[in-house]
């Protein structure tokens, strides 16, 4: 026999062959045993702070993950991190956002490197840990950055495991292989179905790790007990979650340049106007506790625990019923198998699956429209929202308008001169706002700096020579402001912050709050959440039992931070409200779409909870009827587990259809709120043309009209503030107080 070998390679002798054969054995001996592996795995799961720090950066903006005390230590720890970064040359802006669990930094890449920022954060963390005497500090919380790939990777692995388990279960069922008793999954079911046990495990290893661990255990049990119906529902849920995560990452990728370009900017174009986090605050103070954890009074600094929704109520009741039925089966029937099957029958699988499918589909559709999910868990709380707080600044447009004037001539003159004024430019008392010929508009407030966009507006004096007349400047309403308030009314109670410029639509709100004062404080500091006006209002509503959704731009950042669901508007040229859960664009139509999902979310959860209770009741009944001595068979398995699986599948389909229907609605036509009675004919035509895009030139000079798919705007007259009659000068001859609206 001829041995084939490469040239120059000698054939191994017996000694070499023996050593080669013994090598795998020595390697196996060097590997840790199962017990050591289990201890190491437990150590890694319970100390997630040992994994590498997550960092995202692009074009002069960086989001750096915080670890330990730097993240959970409250305002003082957050201030230490941001102050250390601000001291670096080239850093324009730095602020900790506990919603993301990161410090957000705007910097000049030519002066400072990202590695320098990370090193500075690490130095502060080590100093804080040394002061606290806690070693490496507390473990990380569970928040995820939308650009991270870890959640998508974890869900993909879980999908692969569930799919493999489904194949094993289906193959075993077809070839009639022996299966493990269905009751073998009772232990996993007890941990998964008992809210307290699940919460204790989540506190130990984190909510995301808990979901994965229980998912893997359920897949393993489903494969051994040959339950492809259960695994099929799990696979569909994983697919929906993966689609949601991928859509969210793509949405952030599309808008990253736009969002990070404005990260270091002030809230207004005028350098004299402090932005969020500046001397006049308004970005909201971080609480001692962040957004970590699924519930409880410490979650987001809530004054009381988050109220239970239909899914939580059904889960708690079924958990108690499952333990009671399992105990009865064990004591009365003296059958561990019967007890385990009764526990499995009480699993709230349909309730969770229905809400999860609705939330995942809603997140995917919103992300496809450019809405960035900074914290997608808020979509799982949409079914509990019963109060919507709208910050009036989010409803404003981009043009200055006259709210009131001494007489009609003053109104017309001021309206003409204010046409190109930036509504967020601030003025000192006596400063000239605009000038035209011999007429000047002068700021007439008492002290400080004021803007037309401020809640009380900008008082003006119209001076022509020695003659002066008074006027009040405000901001036009966004065309979809009324649609947002009407959509909010469909969610429950509507709370609106008081603002002179939104008085026309304030009647759509149930409660009008006075504008929150802007507290004075040291530069670089941020107001405490308890001291911040809007955040305090949110906490008062929460203490009264409400689940609050806040709609705001960057001026309501502290309210977004305290809200149960925060919907933020990222206006062009201004810093995005990173404290929001859902980051919309500059159009209110995005907010309208988010609010449209809330009533169907509540209805879907109620329907899923009803299906879950009904399926569990039927499954428990069939289990009792079959008795502990029934022989295992396909028919018996279908009778025992079929109702729960059928209820879960129905809930999944219901959630999917409900979310798609909620997303399908057409955007309403914009409504134009204008003081038509106070305008001249030429001014009215100009205003209408600017708002609708219509051509106001003479008919002979207009091009041929082209068809458009955009809805025509509705026209409404601006109403005076409630309780205040307009001065006679605001009404032209024969004008009515409120003009009728033209249809679309």
Report residues per predicted region.
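Cytosolic-side membrane-insertion boundary helix
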Residues: 132-175, 179, 307, 593-619
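Conserved ATP-binding TGD loop and adjacent catalytic N/P-domain core of P-type ATPases
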Residues: 445-649, 656-724, 732-734
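Conserved short beta-strand edge segments in small beta-sheet-based binding/regulatory domains
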Residues: 56, 119, 123-144
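Hydrophobic alpha-helical transmembrane segments
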Residues: 165-387, 392, 398, 409, ...
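Short, charged/polar, Gly/Pro-enriched secondary-structure boundary elements
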Residues: 72, 110-115, 442, 447-449
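Short acidic amphipathic segments
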Residues: 50-52, 57, 61-111, 123, ...
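Extended, compositionally biased intrinsically disordered regions at domain boundaries
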Residues: 2-62
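Acidic, Ser/Thr-rich low-complexity segments on the non-lumenal side of membrane proteins
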Residues: 61-81, 383-405, 693-698
């Amino acid at each position: 026999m001829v041995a084939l070998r490469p040239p120059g390679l000698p054939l191994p002798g017996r000694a070499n062959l023996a050593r080669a054969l013994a090598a795998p054995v020595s390697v196996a001996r060097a590997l840790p045993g199962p017990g050591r592996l289990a201890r190491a795995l437990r150590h890694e799961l319970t100390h997630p702070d040992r994994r590498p720090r997550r960092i995202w950066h692009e074009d002069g903006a960086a989001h750096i993950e915080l670890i330990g005390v730097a993240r959970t230590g409250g305002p003082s720890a957050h201030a230490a991190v941001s102050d250390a970064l601000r001291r670096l040359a080239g850093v324009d802006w730095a602020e900790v956002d506990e919603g993301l669990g990161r410090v957000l930094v705007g910097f000049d890449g030519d002066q400072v490197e990202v590695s320098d920022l990370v090193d500075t954060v690490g130095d502060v963390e080590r100093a804080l840990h040394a002061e606290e005497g806690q070693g490496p500090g507390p473990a990380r919380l569970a928040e995820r950055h939308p650009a991270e790939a870890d959640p998508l990777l974890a869900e993909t692995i879980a999908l692969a495991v569930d799919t493999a388990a489904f194949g094993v279960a289906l193959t075993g069922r077809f070839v009639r292989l022996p299966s493990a008793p269905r009751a073998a999954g009772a232990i996993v079911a007890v941990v998964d179905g008992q809210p307290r046990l699940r919460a204790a495990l989540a506190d130990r290893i984190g909510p995301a790790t808990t979901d994965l661990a229980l998912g893997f255990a359920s897949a393993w049990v489903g494969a051994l007990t040959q339950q492809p119906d259960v695994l099929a529902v799990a696979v569909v849920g994983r697919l929906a979650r993966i689609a949601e995560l991928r859509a969210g990452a793509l949405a952030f990728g599309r808008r990253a340049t736009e969002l990070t370009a404005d990260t270091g900017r002030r809230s207004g174009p005028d350098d004299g106007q402090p932005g969020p986090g500046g001397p006049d605050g308004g970005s909201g103070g971080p609480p001692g506790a962040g957004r970590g954890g699924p519930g409880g009074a410490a979650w987001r600094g809530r004054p009381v625990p988050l109220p239970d929704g239909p899914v939580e109520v059904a889960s708690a009741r079924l958990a108690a019923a499952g333990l009671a039925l399992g105990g009865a089966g064990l004591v009365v029937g003296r059958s561990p198998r019967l007890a385990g099957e009764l526990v499995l029958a009480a699993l709230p699988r349909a309730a969770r699956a229905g809400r999860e499918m609705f939330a995942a589909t809603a997140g995917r559709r919103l992300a496809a429209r450019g809405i960035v999910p900074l914290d997608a868990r808020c979509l799982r709380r949409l079914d509990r929202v019963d109060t919507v707080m709208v910050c009036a600044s989010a409803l404003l447009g981009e043009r200055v308008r006259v709210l009131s004037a001494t007489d009609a001539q003053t109104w017309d003159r001021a309206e003409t001169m204010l046409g190109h004024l930036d509504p967020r430019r601030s003025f000192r008392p006596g400063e000239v706002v605009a000038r035209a010929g011999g007429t000047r508009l002068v700021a007439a407030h008492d002290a400080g700096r004021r803007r037309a966009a401020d809640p009380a507006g900008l008082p003006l004096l119209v001076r022509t020579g020695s003659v002066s007349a008074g006027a009040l400047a405000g901001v036009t309403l966004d065309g979809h402001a009324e649609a947002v308030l009407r959509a909010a009314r469909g969610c429950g109670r509507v709370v609106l912050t008081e603002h002179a410029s939104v008085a026309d639509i304030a009647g759509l709100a149930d409660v009008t709050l006075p504008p929150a004062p802007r507290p004075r404080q040291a530069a670089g500091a941020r107001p405490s959440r308890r001291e911040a006006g809007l955040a305090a209002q949110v906490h008062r509503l929460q203490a009264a039992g409400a689940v609050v959704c806040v709609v705001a731009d960057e001026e309501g950042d502290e309210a977004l931070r305290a809200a149960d669901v925060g919907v933020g508007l990222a206006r062009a040229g201004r810093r995005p409200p990173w404290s929001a859960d859902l980051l919309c664009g500059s159009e209110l139509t995005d907010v309208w779409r988010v609010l449209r999902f809330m009533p169907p979310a509540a209805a879907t959860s109620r329907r899923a909870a009803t299906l879950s209770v009904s399926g569990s009741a039927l499954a428990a009944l069939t289990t009792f009827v079959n008795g502990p001595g029934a022989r295992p068979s396909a028919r018996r398995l279908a009778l025992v587990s079929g109702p729960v699986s059928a209820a879960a599948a129905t809930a999944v389909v219901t959630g999917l259809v409900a979310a798609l229907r909620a997303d399908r609605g057409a955007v309403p036509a914009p409504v134009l709120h204008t003081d038509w009675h106070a305008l001249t004919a030429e001014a009215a035509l100009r205003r209408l043309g600017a708002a609708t895009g219509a051509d106001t030139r003479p008919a002979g000079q207009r091009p041929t009209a082209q068809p458009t798919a955009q809805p025509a705007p509705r026209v409404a007259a601006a109403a005076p503030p409630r309780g205040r009659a307009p001065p006679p000068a605001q009404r032209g001859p024969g004008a009515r107080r409120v003009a009728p609206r033209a249809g679309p």
